[in-house]
Regions:
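Juxtamembrane/disordered regions of integral membrane proteins
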Residues: 7-145
């Protein structure tokens, strides 16, 4: 148990691990829809300058493993944040997810994409996927604890 000032506890035993796993599954489903050949993948692939071979194909096991791990870490962090923010409704959880996305994900990606020379189009595509995940994670974890 990690205890911070004002008695905010980060107690892993209070996490609903089934809800976290559901968030990870939702994230994978969202990503597969978001980056589907019929949705944003062709535009994203063109903007990143991709060739005929798709990204990550040389080591798909590691790519997917780290993707699932990243989603798991996000869901666990969101579980702690909705508890710390006292979010107990779908609306308050969704707003918590939105504010975390708006305050941390969107600006971080913006700086990274601009300095990498990728511009706003790829930024918008990539952060949109995370926006959906964060709002759903916040809403779900607020009511399913």
């Amino acid at each position: 148990v990690i205890i911070y000032p004002k008695e905010i506890e980060m107690d892993f035993s209070t996490i609903n691990w089934l809800a976290v796993i559901v968030c990870v599954v939702i994230s994978m489903i969202n990503g597969s829809i978001w980056y589907n050949p019929k949705t944003f993948f062709p535009m994203w692939w063109k903007v990143v300058g991709g060739g005929r071979e798709q990204p990550g194909m040389e080591n798909m096991g590691m790519t997917w493993g780290l993707t699932v791990l990243a989603s798991f870490v996000q869901a666990v962090a969101m579980a702690f944040m909705v508890k710390a923010m006292n979010s107990t409704t779908i609306a308050s959880g969704a707003m918590t997810g939105f504010m975390l996305w708006f305050g941390f994900i969107a600006p971080t990606y913006l700086v990274n994409k601009l300095f990498a020379g990728h511009g706003l189009k790829i930024w918008a595509i990539e952060i949109g996927n995370h926006l959906v995940n964060f709002v759903i994670f916040g809403a779900l974890l607020s009511v399913w604890h």
